[in-house]
A protein has these predicted regions:
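Internal intein/HINT superfamily modules and their associated LAGLIDADG
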Residues: 1-182
Length: 182
């Protein structure tokens, strides 16, 4: 839900765009899905520089209809609601949401998530942890996690196969700083 969108053209298409260094996620997805689509470069102008991203476009109406049922719709960032998932998939969804629209502080146990209020509630309920909401403005939620930080990281990353490596490394650096290693 974080870095992908469904677009209505002549038919529905699903597009996901990631930093070039994270393209391995797209490759793993295609391999597991046994997809024949290709990953292409997308050049984006950023601060007077051309930045190359990797983009996957899937033109499959049934696939797109299933995503729409789960809330992946145009302009979803403004209206996103939690998907209807079995409990065994919630942590994977939340990890993907945080990988795409979240930030893990390198200096303290803080997570920042840019999302709707309904999705934020969903995440906080899944964590069931001692969390203080610091700020919620313009769909940006900052929250500190104190004593349950380690348990939340285990919940998100234990036996996980898909994640953004650079985000995981950032989290593990914080854990190491606090004397907790996985």
């Amino acid at each position: 839900m974080a870095d992908g969108c469904v677009i209505k053209r002549k038919s529905y298409v699903f597009e996901v765009t990631l930093k070039s260094e994270d393209a391995y996620i797209l490759e793993a997805f295609l391999q597991d899905a046994k997809g024949t689509y290709s990953i292409k470069d997308k050049v984006v102008k950023y601060k007077n520089n051309n930045v190359i991203y990797k983009r996957l476009i899937i033109s499959d109406s049934e696939f797109c209809r299933n995503l729409i049922k789960q809330g992946v719709v145009p302009n979803k960032s403004l209206i996103a609601n939690p998907p209807l998932l079995d409990d065994k998939y919630k942590r994977h969804f939340i990890r993907g949401l945080l990988d795409g629209d979240g930030h893990y502080s390198k200096s303290r146990r803080r997570i920042t998530l840019t999302t709707t209020y309904n999705l934020l509630k969903y995440v906080l309920q899944a964590f069931n942890a001692d969390i203080s909401l610091i700020h919620l403005k313009n769909n940006i939620a900052y929250f500190d996690i104190s004593k349950n930080y380690y348990l939340i990281i285990i919940y998100l990353y234990f036996n996980a196969h898909y994640y953004i490596n650079r985000k995981r490394e950032s989290i593990f650096a914080v854990l190491h700083r606090y004397g907790k290693d996985m």
